[in-house]
A protein has these predicted regions:
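Histidine-centered nuclease catalytic patch
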Residues: 1-14, 26-45
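Cys/His-coordinated zinc-binding microdomains
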Residues: 17-20
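Cys/His-rich microdomains that often coordinate metals
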Residues: 23
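Helix-loop elements that line ligand-binding/catalytic pockets
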Residues: 31-106
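C-terminal, charged low-complexity interaction regions
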Residues: 75-169
């Protein structure tokens, strides 16, 4: 362990238990990876049906691949680490988002939109919801407003991801 960095706030990033334990004490060069507090990781990491995570071609690919591997976001059902159920949680969130989008199409009123946002706040998986609702500008705005800490400077006026100022993507 690097004693100098161990208690530095600049070396502190909140992450889920699985991401932290998968990374463990791996010694890394932070500039070889993308970080959600410095980069627009939503621009470089793709979330897809089935809970799958991949790199967006042409956007800091090497750095995105390295962070995905470091924290194990690429683990899938066929990976031996059965205790890591993040892929399953992402798949369930994806399916929930699809159902919510279908219901919104049948009942497109503010109350339904507000209910969906309440569900997102309670369940998480913001990136999945942003992906599923990518063609609904109102929902994208609501999603960005709903979760404190979302960097609105990472998106253009149509809510498409753009490079984060000072970041790698």
């Amino acid at each position: 362990m690097n004693e100098e960095r161990a208690l530095s706030w600049n070396n502190f990033l909140l992450a889920c238990t699985n991401c932290n334990s998968t990374k463990g004490n791996t010694d890394i060069n932070i500039y070889d990876y993308l970080w959600p507090d410095r980069d627009n990781t939503f621009r470089a990491i793709r979330y897809a049906e089935g809970g799958l995570v991949s790199v967006v071609p042409g956007v800091a690919e090497i750095h995105a691949k390295k962070i995905i591997e470091l924290i194990g976001l690429d683990r899938t059902p066929d990976t031996p680490e059965a205790s890591d159920r993040r892929w399953l949680n992402r798949r369930e969130a994806w399916e929930m988002a699809i159902r919510a989008k279908d219901r919104l199409m049948c009942c497109n009123v503010d109350a339904m939109r507000e209910q969906i946002i309440e569900l997102v706040v309670a369940k998480g998986f913001w990136s999945i919801w942003m992906t599923v609702f990518k063609d609904d500008i109102d929902m994208l705005q609501r999603l960005m407003d709903a979760l404190p800490g979302t960097s609105k400077t990472c998106f253009d006026a149509t809510h498409q991801p753009i490079a984060r100022s000072g970041g790698q993507c």
